């Protein structure tokens, strides 16, 4: 027989969660390369549904028969939550909603990642995020620190929540910017393999383009 894809589109399936009856459960970047959502679709490719509760970055831990699964995650604006869902995507129990931590962070104040996309002088679209001081004044100029990793297939610009040293630096009056250059992951095979056999050149070019964009 001839094999046919169940799904298709300009996005990646990042994980196969399981098969229950005639439904396939999988995680993909369909809404954005920055996000991970759980989807369910028939083996015939029809009746596709997104099951995760909202746009964000989620991890899924299914039971053996996929009658239930644990959904953990959220977006970059606040700590995520952990819930149990049934196979139909209905929340049946909240294990942890991080409410105490959310209240404490609301009082303390933390910068929120601002995501952006820009086009380099070579015509490549790159995704990035920016952290600004809480008292940011658009009329002022600030020192900018570019942070990056850029390893093949990696990703630093994503919707998941998780404060790091960058948040501390922002409190001292810096803007922190991170951009995933050519060769990083979750934007398709062609984009990821642009640096194959040529590590170090394109990544540096894209960081220079980022600095020019921020100037």
Which stretches of residues belong to each language-model region?
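Short, solvent-exposed loop/turn segments at conserved positions within beta-propeller repeat blades
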Residues: 30-35, 75-78
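C-terminal structured "cap/appendage" subdomains that terminate the fold
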Residues: 34-36, 42, 66-68
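Short, conserved, GDST-rich strand-edge loop motifs in beta-rich repeat architectures
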Residues: 28-30, 154
